[in-house]
UniProtKB/Swiss-Prot annotation:
Organism taxonomic ancestry: Bacteria, Bacillati, Cyanobacteriota, Cyanophyceae, Nostocales
Reactions that this protein is recorded to catalyse: [[Fe-S] cluster scaffold protein carrying a second [4Fe-4S](2+) cluster] + N(6)-octanoyl-L-lysyl-[protein] + 2 oxidized [2Fe-2S]-[ferredoxin] + 2 S-adenosyl-L-methionine + 4 H(+) = [[Fe-S] cluster scaffold protein] + N(6)-[(R)-dihydrolipoyl]-L-lysyl-[protein] + 4 Fe(3+) + 2 hydrogen sulfide + 2 5'-deoxyadenosine + 2 L-methionine + 2 reduced [2Fe-2S]-[ferredoxin]
Species whose genome carries this gene: Nostoc sp. (strain PCC 7120 / SAG 25.82 / UTEX 2576)
A UniProt-annotated Pfam family: Radical_SAM
Gene name of the record: lipA2
Cofactor binding annotation: Binds 2 [4Fe-4S] clusters per subunit. One cluster is coordinated with 3 cysteines and an exchangeable S-adenosyl-L-methionine.
Identification of the protein by name: Lipoyl synthase 2
Major localization class: cytoplasm
GO terms of molecular function: 4 iron, 4 sulfur cluster binding; lipoate synthase activity; metal ion binding
Length: 300
């Protein structure tokens, strides 16, 4: 980054509204989690994505583990996660390492997510299941939510392959199945390169088809240039496929290489969006500037 680029990015950070600034949490809680994660050479999206809520979540005994390495095979224009080069081979011991970390941290609720791994035979679906099994062996009282990619691409690409991979995870019975559509239909192309809006809806629809008892969840980030009408359309699309839970948060630009923020939505606007979502029938809604997809997940 050049000096002028650095100055530009610093000015953008300075211009962020006050409601997006908050303390990160107790240093002792952060360092404990970071030490255990580093010792086991595993990853959390809390750290890789620099989540502003990680201190609060750690204090509430929740965390979101990032499976299959920190490098994604896709190049979404909003995401902080590493991308642009070949990902690492899978660690066959990762499930056990995550289970041990859950035990040491005394976590009551765990979210498992992953980078997209289009290079793998089953996109990593079996790795999710293996990790869930390992966690349950050591932590039988811990609930597990999954936040998955769309499982499209690679060998066996297409609807049948996607269905088979999702079925594998549904049969492992997560406490909640989350897949984020991230943005409105019009902006999916520029925001989520390599993803398709209807393909993401299909993920959540398949979960309900395979097991209607499993709660489904999705998330939207605002600030890309969407309108309220487009957000209502997206929420309607989610309700039409039986999606139960919704999170809405503010997009914050991680670097100059990412999409610029078009608008900072106010807390009052988030309250309005949350009210609309609840009126549509979502059973659990989190809508606020700093909300992320796993925010207060254990309270749902």
């Amino acid at each position: 980054m050049t000096a002028s680029q650095s100055a530009q990015f610093k000015s953008e950070i300075t211009a962020m509204p006050s409601w997006l600034r908050r303390p990160i949490g107790k240093a002792s809680e952060l360092s404990t989690v970071q030490r255990i994660i580093k010792q086991r050479q595993i990853h959390t999206i809390c750290e890789e994505g620099r989540c502003p809520n990680r201190g609060e979540c750690y204090a509430q005994k929740t965390a979101t583990f990032l499976l299959m390495g920190p490098t994604c095979t896709r190049v979404c224009a909003f995401c902080q996660v590493d991308k642009g080069h070949a990902p690492m081979p899978l660690d066959p011991e990762e499930g056990q390492k995550v289970a041990e970390a859950v035990q040491l941290l005394g976590l009551r609720y765990v979210v498992l997510t992953s980078v997209a791994r289009d290079d793998l035979q089953d996109q990593g679906a079996s790795h999710f299941v293996q990790t869930m099994e390992a966690i349950r062996q050591l932590n039988p009282g811990t609930q597990i939510e999954v936040l998955t990619p769309d499982f499209w691409g690679g060998a066996g690409a297409g609807e049948s392959g996607q269905r088979q991979r999702i079925k594998m995870i549904v049969e492992a019975q997560p406490a909640c199945f989350n897949h984020n559509i991230e943005t409105v239909r019009r902006l999916t192309g520029p925001v989520r390169r390599g993803a398709k809006y209807d393909r993401s809806l299909r993920v959540l629809s398949l979960v309900k088809e395979l097991n209607p008892r499993i709660p489904t969840k999705s998330g939207l980030m605002v600030g890309y240039g969407e309108t309220v009408a487009e957000l209502v359309e997206a929420m309607t699309d989610l309700r039409n496929i039986g999606c139960d839970r919704l999170t809405i948060g503010q997009y914050m630009r991680p670097s100059l290489e990412h999409l610029p923020v078009q608008k900072y939505w106010t807390p009052e606007e988030f309250e309005h969006l949350g009210k609309l979502a609840r009126e549509m029938g979502f059973s659990h809604v989190r809508s606020a500037p700093l909300v992320r997809s796993s925010y207060h997940a254990g309270e749902e």
